[in-house]
Amino acid sequence: MPTVSCVSSLKSVAFAVGVAVIALSPLAARAEALLVVEADTGKVLQAENATIPWYPASVTKLMTTYVTLKAVKEGRITLDTLVTVSPIAAAQSPSKMGFRSGTQVTIDNALKMMMVKSANDMAVVLAEGVGGSIDGFSALMNENAARLGMTQTSYVNPNGLPAEGQITSARDLAILA
């Protein structure tokens, strides 16, 4: 009968072989659009339809985080700055935290709730707190996207809820990531 350490070793070998087979498959991942980039060098390892436009959905919140943390870095706000849930933020579709209008949260907590729960209301709270309005914040998002070289991206809201004109590509998201 095999010992526990022997079984554990066999499982490790089986896992390693499985990972190696997946890694060596020419098309290990399938998607309408994909771009696999080596983080340290920027070398493209695999690309399929990397420049076709597509709807960004909740990955929009990565740019919301980027713009908010840039404002912190520039000293315009701090992570302890209080922001208020507006009626517009409170009315966002789920996923959301569901705070009542008038509730105050810190930038830090709003960021955490937005990123962990994908809270659409917190994305709007951050947009209004940093950019003054959804439109003002969307302009900041687009300015930053252009500055980063994201030439196929246009943002119209901070949370990724369906909106005409909100578009990106796998290539542009790789730049942001």
Regions found by a protein language model. Name each.
Residues 1-16:
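Bacterial N-terminal signal peptides that target proteins for export
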Residues 14-25:
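Bacterial N-terminal signal peptides
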Residues 26-171:
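Active-site-adjacent loops and short helices of periplasmic peptidoglycan-processing enzymes
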Residues 172-177:
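Extracytoplasmic
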